[in-house]
Amino acid sequence: MRSSSKQEELVKAFKALLKEEKFSSQGEIVLALQEQGFENINQSKVSRMLTKFGAVRTRNAKMEMVYCLPAELGVPTTSSPLKNLVLDIDYNDAVVVIHTSPGAAQLIARLLDSLGKSEGILGTIAGDDTIFTTPANGFSVKDLYEAILMLFEQEL
């Protein structure tokens, strides 16, 4: 029970730090947590927590790259479907454009990149809430669009 309470305190402190302060590296987050009394924290633990809570690196108003939690979503978890993060998918002759909730584009783009060329994805470019995806050789933009639509429908 004691360790789960320490874990809850760590999670609470971690989320509060990401909301209140700007961190440009995982090392800075480690130091801030250590200053709050979490001696056993290290970079790999912080990296896992960033992934678990859907934190992304994005540019703030001063154009600095900082870690943040997706603001409007609360925190996506492994039980929340990624489909909820995708707001719209459309295409033209060159690219498929995916609009996401703020802060979620990099998470979705990483998923798409992991599928790779065999699934028709040559690559992605992600901003804060928009992703451009281009098809690999042998795939049309429409094929890629339909594959992405099916992928997010299956996430229900």
Curated annotation (Swiss-Prot):
It is found in: Cytoplasm. Pathway: Amino-acid biosynthesis; L-arginine biosynthesis [regulation]. Keywords: Amino-acid biosynthesis, Arginine biosynthesis, Cytoplasm, DNA-binding, Repressor, Transcription, Transcription regulation. One of its GO terms (biological process) is protein complex oligomerization. The keyword Translocase does not apply. GO terms for cellular component: cytoplasm. Pfam families: Arg_repressor, Arg_repressor_C. GO terms for molecular function: arginine binding; DNA binding; DNA-binding transcription factor activity. It comes from the Bacteria. Its main location: cytoplasm. Regulates arginine biosynthesis genes. Belongs to the ArgR family. HAMAP family: Arg_repressor. This is Arginine repressor.
